[in-house]
Amino acid sequence: VSVITSSHLHDKPLRPEDATNITLTKDSLEAEDNNGRFEIMKPPGAWKDFFDRMLSEKGGGKKRKASNFTTPFNGERYRCILADSSGGQVITMRKLMRSIPRVDKDLGLDWNAIRPLLEGSGLTIFAGQMSSGKSTTMISAIEQLGRKRGNLGTVEDPIEVEFQGGGVIQREVGTHVDSFAEAIRDFVRQYRNTIMVGEIRDPETADAAVLAASLGHSVVGTLHADSAIDIPTRMASLLDPKLARILPSVLRGLWWQHVYRRGDGKSKPLPIYESLYVTNSVRQIIADGPEKLPQLMNEMVSQKRVSMAQSATAWVSKNQATREELRQWLETRGRINDSQLDYVR
């Protein structure tokens, strides 16, 4: 491997095979691993051959339209997007999981904080920004529930990992079903106790998820949001107004997380998270409107749940990170502000 540049010149060079995120062109390969290490190199022979093969197999059709696909390579599975650019064709790749990690031992999260958010029926949202690990946490939590979850239906884009042991229907958007919403409606008719939605990203999916939860199913999905308190706002902005009114009654649990990666090749990723169990008092606050949502912080305190600032502070106190590194989570980041209130009025 010919390294052009590295984010950490004294570390052992990062191999493409060890990267979780890759950007590949005919002349360069950008690699980033789960610890945040980043390097740019010339594509090794096997990767150059892969690039040429994907252009031949997937590069047809309209140049301005990206091609999304999942493919095996070098013993791994990758989620790929092939797209045109001013510099030529580009393939962005994300390595998919081989097996399901454990919530506590592998992800470093508190299972006792997550478990109550998944009990019974209703809607539980795992939120965060891009590359925050929210999907991995959701999948790990569902796996750890085991038989308590009942029979399971999952819809993803793509399927991240296969659940083992039977009692599972897994569907991939674009391969087995046309949309997330269609799969959710099918799962309701197929009597799936638990329905896992890879991403709630459009109104149709949000509406279907809330309807399924209102019918007594356990619905679990991911959503882009800046904090646990931000989740009801983001969810309501997607929903039909009639369904937005019943959102407080079907919500069961809110989980938000981010993963800080130092990028030194030695430090483990540090999870920063906060959560809220949706009690009757929480439902009332959400129902009272966006102006009342900051009161959810008090509910978090009364439930003895960790806020994102407390979670970040714990890593600083353990000398795993500095205050400067985690400053954006130690401050009042992602809380309700005027622009968010205007967005949902």
Labelled PLM ranges:
Residues 1-345:
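Short, flexible helix-loop junctions that flank or precede catalytic/ligand sites
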